[in-house]
Regions:
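Copper-binding active sites and cupredoxin-like electron-transfer domains
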Residues: 1-411
Length: 411
């Protein structure tokens, strides 16, 4: 007999995931991980005590942000795939069905296991051909943040989205209790404007940068209560390194894909770099309420639909050229003469299925952000972790124009 113990509906919404988790959290020996804009993989228990997970790899439609959908290759219909959560010591039995048009295998990145379960096509196993189902089985002897991803035609399969987290909680946890635990995949894509299929052949010139395969303003915020101890796990199987910066707080890097970092070797940071093939886990106490920016600090990564090899027109008067171009392209709008902030306010129609360069709005206006950007929302006295709305700043704590102050003084 197979017994369903724990799982969540595969809904790409952090809020639906939160409500499902609330019903099961009391019976768990750990704080469940939240995968913003993602989900956690259900499992069943076999008679021998093995936790059974089922993965189908195939094609899917994936929303990067409102207004942009891509043709992705996915695990269980989503990218990143559902997060697998286990406890150190668990016996895992994972069935993988291939619905792709080519062979594949699944590698359990950073996990110590028998060589034949490592998941490398041709080297440690035969390729899982289209229509076939393979079984992986191993005991989880570690705890920490790990990843699973394709290991056959990596360029195409991972380039189109086949990756996910495998998180192993310690059997005997030590240290302070974690109140909120998040997992975020860092990735980059090249999608030709006006098209839907990412080009996996691109090596460096990416134009879409994502947290969990979503670009701002499509990224879910991280909602926490004031005083919560927060853990954020980052994973990267892309091409680029990403320095992720948190406003308002310092954190400590507590573990890597290689294991825990002893407290004596930890130091405070406000930016953590995760290189390709690595995971990094940070912890901090969210003790100051507000809406705090959380983003990649490479200048082009918190933007969307980035172009390459464009002419530098800073300081160039484009009025004459603009009029001539409009004769050929009605509605053409010149840009870049005074910087790119004007993109926040322009309503220039772009190619179909293409995000604006900077499309996010805050309570005070355009943010000038896109791509790898989200918000840590810290609030006092939250009843739940639903979106709390804009932060109500106390009077006198928001920067403002001194011209307005002068006008008030004159009156």
């Amino acid at each position: 007999m197979t017994v369903v113990l724990f799982g969540f509906i595969n809904i790409p919404s952090i809020y639906a995931q939160e409500k499902n988790k609330a019903m099961a959290v009391e019976n768990l020996p750990y704080t469940p991980v939240v995968t913003p804009n993602g989900s956690t993989m259900p499992w069943t228990l076999d008679k021998d005590g093995a936790k059974v997970f089922r993965i189908t790899v195939g094609k899917c439609q994936h929303e990067v942000a409102p207004g942009m959908v891509i043709n992705a290759w996915c695990y269980n219909g989503q990218t990143p795939g559902p997060t697998i959560e286990v406890v150190e010591g668990d016996l895992l039995r994972i069935y993988v069905k291939n619905e792709l048009p080519e062979g594949t295998a699944v590698h359990w990145h950073g996990i110590f296991l028998p060589n034949g379960m490592d998941g490398v096509s041709g080297l440690t196993q035969k390729s899982i051909e289209p229509g076939q189902t393979f079984k992986y089985e191993f005991r989880m002897t570690q705890h920490g943040t790990f990843m699973y991803h394709s290991h056959g035609d990596e360029m195409t399969q991972m380039g189109l989205g086949t990756m996910g987290f495998l998180i192993s909680h310690p059997k005997n946890p030590t240290g302070p209790k974690i109140d909120r635990d998040f997992a975020i995949f860092l990735n980059e894509w090249f999608v030709e404007p006006g098209t839907k299929t990412p080009n996996p052949n691109i090596m460096t010139d990416f134009n879409i940068f994502t947290f969990n395969s979503r670009a701002f303003p499509g990224t879910a915020p991280l909602v926490v209560k004031t005083g919560d101890r927060v853990r954020v796990r980052f994973g990267n199987v892309g091409q680029e390194s990403h320095p992720i910066h948190l406003h308002g707080f310092a954190f400590k890097i507590v573990s890597t894909d290689g294991g825990d970092i002893p407290p004596s070797a930890q130091w405070p940071e406000t930016t953590v770099v995760t290189f390709p093939g690595q995971t990094r886990t940070v912890e901090f106490v969210a003790d100051v309420p507000g809406d705090w920016a959380f983003h990649c600090h490479r200048r082009h990564h918190p933007m969307n639909a980035m172009g390459h090899d464009a002419a530098n027109v800073l300081g160039v008067n484009q009025d004459d050229v603009k009029d001539k171009v409009r004769d050929l392209v009605p509605g053409y709008m010149a840009m870049g003469e005074n910087g790119m902030d004007e993109m926040n306010y322009m309503n220039m129609k772009g190619p179909e299925n293409t995000l604006p360069m900077m499309g996010g709005q805050g309570q005070f206006g355009p943010t000038g952000m896109g791509g790898m950007f989200t918000v840590l929302m810290v609030r006092d006295n939250l009843k739940d972790y639903d979106h709390p709305g804009d932060y109500p700043h106390p009077k006198g704590t928001v920067a403002g124009s001194i011209d307005q102050e002068k006008e008030k003084g004159e009156k």
